Amino acid sequence: MSVKHISSAILGVGVDDTTIDLFESQYPVPTGVSYNSYVIRDEKTTILDTVDHRATEEWLANLTEALDGRKPEYLIVSHMEPDHGANIAKLAALYPEMKVVGNAKTFLYMDQFFGPEAVAKDRRVTVKDGESLNLGSHTLTFVFAPMVHWPEVMVSYESSEKVLFSADGFGRFGAVAKFDEKADWASEARRYYLNIVGKYGPQVQALLKKAAALDIKTICPLHGPVLTGDLGKYLNYYDMWSSYKPEEPEKILVASASIHGHTRSAAHILAEKLRAKGAKVVEMDLTRTDVSYAVTEAFRCGKTVLACATYDGFLFPPMEALLTHLKTKNFQNRTVGLMENGTWAPMAAKLMRAELDGMKNMTVCDAVVTIRSAVNAAAEAQMDALAEELVNK
């Protein structure tokens, strides 16, 4: 990704990483990810954030091109996570007169990552929530966004061009060069938000309230494309996701964790019964689908069926992983149906119910499907009852 002119004074110097397979060592990114960084060229030229260590050399080349002989006055640190902060010490060494701007927690974490000698005390500019920094014809106002999704996070609002530098907010998986402006921004933004930030809905709501007081024309996130045009659709998505409201209240996810295929087969039979009743259904085989996609679909749908085999008296691990992730991400306000399978001692429904009981505002259907080895007439009758209950909830 080469230097991108966002305006005559604001340039993007980020890097696309198309060789990474797992973001944060766990989330598949088949189209890569971008590490975004920005430069404001003014009387006091300013860099906003660095990039991951995987992208250092390309980023430095982009930065050199964007600076065009200028020496940066400031580095703004929005977020200390290593995919954005990895090159702080290197940049500070390259430009020994440059000052580093952050808040008290920023510098606490900076010392933990790099040691206090990386950025000397007299080079640190510690800002408070709402304070501003004049760069010449541009002014940055710092808006703290704690736990979106780390404690030190702050966003920066540039008032003359009405640009919000939003840290990880409004980020998206996928390399920017591969993003089609006509494509569905929400698909990988949704998966990014729900798996990275999803736990912190109240904190995102607090940030959205602060952002509502700002006149924003452009959003510059630390991952994904720069957002322009109708920003309302992006803000509406964030409001919905952070309020834990389903995008499609009547849509049903049928997620199965099957050892030898019988539970998956039963889940498909139930899905077909739901479709016959007019329901919109998506099926996911948890043994073949990364959990991040299942988490995303569970949040998107208003209703979910969890179909799981009993395994050594516990849940089959793919289902256990899904429930653990859902609980971690604050899954709530949904309707769930349960299906279990066990040849001699089916336990999955009881165990799944116990996990769901620890989540907020969950409605668990009264009808439960219990399969002993394979589907029979009794199990089909239970499926009919569960399907009827789900479509009428």
Describe the function of each predicted region.
Residues 255-277:
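Short, charged N-terminal beta->alpha structural module
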Residues 220-248:
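Short N-terminal or domain-adjacent regulatory/targeting segments
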